[in-house]
C-alpha cells in the first residue's frame, strides 16, 4: 500500500494502536481533538473572509460574532457526529485539517502584495503545496483543493482587476471550452463504468449511471435538508435510486440547484454566495459524481463541505438581524447573543441525543433499522449486535428475517451458520455454510467451519477435504492445522503427515492450548518412540 493510498491515515491509526491497543478512548480523543482544531480553523478562515470580501458584503471586517456563529455550528452540528465518533471516518477529519490549513495559508498569501516579501510568499506557497500533498495521502478529497483556491482568488479579485478583465474578455471561449469538456466527461462517465476508477461490483453497487442520476436529489433533499434541519439522522439512510434522467428526483434536484444559483446571482453579495455554494458542491463532487460508492448517501461525506453552507447561513442570519435592528426591535448586540445562544443550545441538545444513539453497536443499529426498515444492512448489523450482546436467539431471528429479504447475501448465511453451530443445529449449519460457499468460495473460514462440523460427525474424508481447502486459500490458521493433525494422527493414521500439520500449527501459535502435548508428540517421533494410537487425541 502506497503513501498516497491513505497512508497517513493508517499511520495515525497505527500510532493509536501502539499507544492504546484496541481501547477506543485514545482513538476518540484524537478524532475529537482534530475536530476542535478544525472548528478553530473555520473561525479564522471566516474572519479572513470578512476582510477579503469587505467590499462585497454588508458587515464590518472585525465582526467576530459571525465567525463565532459559523465555527460554533461547525463544532456542534449533529451531522458531525458520524465523522467524529466513527473511528475510521478519521479520514474526513484529518483530510479536512490539511485542507483548512492550506486554505487559511492561501488567504494569508493573497494579502502579501509587497514585492519585498517575496521570501515569505515563497514559504507560504510551498506550505500550501505541502498541506495539499500530505492531505491527499489521507483522502483524495484534496483533489478539489486547487479549484477551490482558484475560485476563491477570482471571487475576491476586484471587478476592475486584470484577472477579471481577462476572464471577461475570453468568457465566451471559456464557456464553450468548459461546456464541451463537461459534456464529454459526463458522457464518458455515464457510458463507461470503468472510466477513471475501474468497474463497480453490480452485486454491491447501483452502477455509475444510476449513482450519478441519484446524487442531485441526495445533495438537495438529504444532505442540505439534514444540515438545515438535523433530525432523524441515520447511519444507513434508505435513499431511492434514480433510474432515468426524466425522473422527478433528478429533475427536482437539478432544478433546485439551478434556482439557488439564480437566486444568489441576483444578490448584491453574489460572488460571496456563489463561492461558498461552489465550496459545498465541489467538495461533495468526488463522492457524488465520479467515484461510485456503496452508499448513495453518508453523513460523514459532508464534513468538509459543511462550512460552505454554514458561512452562507451565518452571514444570512447576520443580515436578517441587521434588518430587524433597522426597525428598532432590539439592539444588535443583544440579538446576536440571543440567537447565538439559541443555536448553540439547540444543536448541542441534538448532538447529545445523537451521541446517545452511537453509544453502543446495538443502539446504533436499532436506530438505523427503525428508520430504514426496508434496507438489508441495518437488519444484518442489528442481528450481529444482538449476537455480540449475547442474545443468540434474537440474533438468529433477525438473521433469518434478513435471509427472507435477501437470501443471496454472504454475511447472514455465514453468521447464521455460526449461531446454528453454537446451538448444536448441525444440519442447519451445514446448509447455511454451503450456501455461503456458493455465494463467496474464497472465504477460508467457511471451509474451516464445515471441516469442524464433519470432524464432529466423524466424516473424516469430508473434514479432511474442507480443512485442506481452507489452508489452500490461507495457510495462517493454527487451529485448522491442529485439526488436520488430529484427523490424520488419530483417525486417518497418516503419521508423518499429521506431524507436519502439528508442527505448522505450533509454529503459527506456540502458546496455543495443548502446545505441550503437541511438542511431546513431535519429540517422541524424532526419538523414534511414537506409535499410532487407536483412541482420540488431545
Language-model segments: residues:
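Polytopic membrane enzymes that build or remodel cell-surface glycoconjugates and lipids
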Residues: 1-419, 432, 445, 449, ...
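C-terminal luminal/periplasmic domains and tails of membrane-associated envelope-modifying transferases
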Residues: 330, 362-538
Amino acid at each position: 500500500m502506497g503513501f498516497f493510498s491513505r497512508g497517513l491515515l493508517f499511520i495515525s491509526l497505527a500510532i493509536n494502536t501502539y499507544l492504546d491497543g484496541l481501547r477506543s478512548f485514545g482513538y476518540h480523543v484524537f478524532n475529537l481533538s482534530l475536530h476542535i482544531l478544525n472548528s478553530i480553523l473555520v473561525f479564522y478562515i471566516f474572519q479572513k473572509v470578512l476582510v477579503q470580501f469587505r467590499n462585497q458584503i454588508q458587515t464590518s471586517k472585525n465582526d467576530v460574532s459571525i465567525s463565532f456563529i459559523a465555527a460554533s455550528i461547525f463544532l456542534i452540528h449533529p451531522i458531525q457526529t458520524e465523522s467524529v465518533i466513527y473511528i475510521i471516518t478519521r479520514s474526513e477529519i484529518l483530510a479536512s485539517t490539511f485542507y483548512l490549513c492550506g486554505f487559511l495559508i492561501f488567504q494569508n498569501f493573497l494579502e502579501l502584495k509587497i514585492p519585498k516579501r517575496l521570501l515569505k510568499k515563497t514559504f507560504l506557497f510551498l506550505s500550501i503545496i505541502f498541506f495539499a500533498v500530505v492531505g491527499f495521502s489521507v483522502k483524495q478529497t484534496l483533489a478539489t483543493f486547487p479549484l477551490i483556491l482558484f475560485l476563491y482568488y477570482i471571487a475576491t479579485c476586484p471587478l476592475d482587476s486584470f484577472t477579471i478583465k481577462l476572464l471577461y474578455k475570453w468568457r465566451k471561449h471559456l464557456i464553450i471550452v468548459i461546456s464541451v469538456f463537461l459534456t464529454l466527461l459526463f458522457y464518458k462517465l455515464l457510458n463507461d463504468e470503468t472510466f477513471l476508477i475501474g468497474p463497480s461490483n453490480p452485486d454491491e453497487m447501483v452502477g455509475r449511471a444510476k449513482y450519478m442520476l441519484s446524487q442531485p436529489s441526495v445533495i438537495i433533499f438529504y444532505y442540505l435538508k439534514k444540515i438545515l434541519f438535523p433530525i432523524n439522522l441515520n447511519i444507513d439512510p434508505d435513499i431511492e435510486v434514480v433510474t432515468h434522467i426524466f425522473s422527478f428526483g433528478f429533475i427536482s434536484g437539478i432544478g433546485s440547484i439551478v434556482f439557488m444559483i439564480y437566486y444568489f446571482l441576483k444578490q448584491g453579495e453574489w460572488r460571496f454566495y456563489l463561492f461558498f455554494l461552489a465550496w459545498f458542491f465541489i467538495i461533495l463532487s468526488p463522492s457524488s459524481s465520479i467515484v461510485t460508492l456503496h452508499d448513495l448517501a453518508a453523513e460523514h461525506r459532508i464534513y468538509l463541505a459543511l462550512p460552505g453552507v454554514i458561512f452562507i447561513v451565518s452571514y444570512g442570519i447576520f443580515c436578517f438581524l441587521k434588518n430587524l435592528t433597522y426597525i428598532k426591535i432590539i439592539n444588535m448586540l443583544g440579538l446576536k447573543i440571543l440567537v447565538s445562544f439559541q443555536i448553540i443550545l439547540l444543536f448541542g441538545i441534538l448532538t447529545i441525543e445523537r451521541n446517545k444513539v452511537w453509544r453502543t453497536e446495538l443502539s446504533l443499529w436499532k436506530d438505523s433499522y427503525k428508520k430504514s426498515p426496508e434496507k438489508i444492512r441495518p437488519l444484518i448489523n442489528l442481528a450481529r449486535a444482538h449476537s455480540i450482546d449475547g442474545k443468540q436467539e434474537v440474533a438468529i431471528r433477525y438473521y433469518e428475517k434478513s435471509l427472507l429479504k435477501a437470501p443471496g447475501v454472504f454475511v447472514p448465511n455465514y453468521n447464521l451458520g455460526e449461531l446454528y453451530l453454537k446451538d448444536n443445529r448441525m444440519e442447519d449449519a451445514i446448509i447455511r455454510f454451503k450456501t455461503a460457499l456458493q455465494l463467496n468460495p474464497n472465504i477460508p473460514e467457511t471451509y474451516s467451519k464445515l471441516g469442524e462440523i464433519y470432524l464432529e460427525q466423524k466424516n473424516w474424508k469430508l473434514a479432511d477435504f474442507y480443512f485442506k481447502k481452507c489452508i489452500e486459500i490461507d495457510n495462517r490458521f493454527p487451529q485448522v492445522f491442529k485439526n488436520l493433525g488430529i484427523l490424520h494422527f488419530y483417525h486417518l493414521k497418516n503419521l508423518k503427515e499429521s506431524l507436519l500439520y502439528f508442527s505448522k500449527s505450533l509454529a503459527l501459535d506456540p502458546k496455543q492450548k495443548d502446545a505441550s502435548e503437541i511438542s511431546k508428540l513431535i519429540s517422541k517421533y524424532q526419538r523414534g518412540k511414537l506409535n499410532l494410537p487407536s483412541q482420540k487425541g488431545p
